Design a protein with these regions (language model features):
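Conserved CoA-thioester-binding segment of acyl-CoA-metabolizing enzymes
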Residues: 1-57, 73, 97
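Short, charged, surface-exposed hinge/linker loops at domain edges
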Residues: 221-227
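Glycine- (often His-adjacent) and acidic-residue-rich active-site loop
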Residues: 56-98, 144-145, 228
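Crotonase-fold acyl-CoA enzyme core
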Residues: 97-214, 242, 246-247, 251-255, ...
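Terminal peptide-recognition signature
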Residues: 17, 21, 36, 54, ...
Length: 268
């Protein structure tokens, strides 16, 4: 499908996904959700894309839900997605599930506000780099809702610990770039104009890995976080490592190491 609220720029094996409603600080609309569901859903079967970089156009990463659209929908009886019986709530929630399910690592470049559902885009990513202007919050609680929404209660405690997650979610206060770096929420903080350049070393390092090795590392991490214990986590590791070890790329990686050269992976 063609997209109106997001844009995809393909650079080799890397997709640069831009939330593209700058006039509304990239606020989330039903159309944006439809497009994000389509895009992230398609990645599961897309072998040519190895990495996704997610960012926002204009002054913000994503200001969260477009409240104006939501109010209009309620007042005018506009179409509401089924969302598994949960309406728009379930419809949007599926985006974050697809972000975690897709085998491609997602790198988020955050500048300006990332609020509510926009904050959850950040949390559902695999690597986060913040511009100096970045500020993030679980904004739901500020508008009479629970802060536990769109995966935030799952992701945030795992990233920063229960204590900081409780503080941020119970108050709705912003966490700014310096503190986000200090508590491990982001990998680094750079001037906003340097965000793209800051992402390039991460991208280059990941592109030097084998395609299957990269995919199964994301999958293994996601599964191990929820594993019942060490043995369950190691069972996942053993399964994935056995699969990787039987590929031609694994043989090439070992040959290249012994021959002191860069490996040439073919994805086989």
């Amino acid at each position: 499908m063609s997209y109106e609220t997001i844009s995809i720029e393909k650079q080799g094996a890397v997709d640069w996904l831009t939330l593209n409603r700058p006039e509304s600080l990239n606020a989330i609309t039903t159309k944006m959700v439809t497009e994000l569901r389509d895009y992230f859903g398609s990645l599961y079967e897309n072998e040519s894309v190895r990495i996704v970089v997610m960012r926002g156009a204009g002054r913000a990463f994503c200001a969260g839900l477009d409240i104006k659209e939501g109010s209009a929908r309620k007042n005018e009886g506009d179409y509401v997605p089924f969302g598994g019986g949960m309406g728009f709530q379930g419809y949007l929630a599926e985006v974050y599930i697809r972000m975690r399910r897709c085998p491609q690592p997602i790198v988020s470049l955050i500048h300006g506000p990332a609020c509510g559902g926009g904050f959850s885009f950040v949390l559902a990513s695999d690597i986060r780099i913040a511009g100096e202007s970045a500020r993030m919050n679980a904004a739901f609680i500020k508008i009479g809702l629970s802060a536990c929404d769109m995966g935030s209660s799952y992701f945030l405690p795992r990233l920063v610990g229960t204590s900081i997650a409780s503080e941020l979610m119970l108050t709705g206060k912003f966490i700014h770039a310096p503190r986000a770096l200090a508590c491990g929420l982001v990998s680094e903080v750079v001037p906003g104009v340097e965000l793209v350049n800051a992402a390039k070393p991460y991208i280059a390092d990941m592109l030097r890995t084998s395609p299957m090795g990269l995919r199964l590392t994301k999958e293994g991490l996601s599964m191990a976080i929820d594993a019942g214990g060490l043995e369950a986590a190691m069972a996942i590791e053993n399964r994935n490592q056995l699969m990787c070890s039987r590929t031609n790329d694994a043989k090439e990686g070992m040959r290249a190491f012994l021959e002191k050269r860069e490996p040439v992976y073919t994805g086989s």
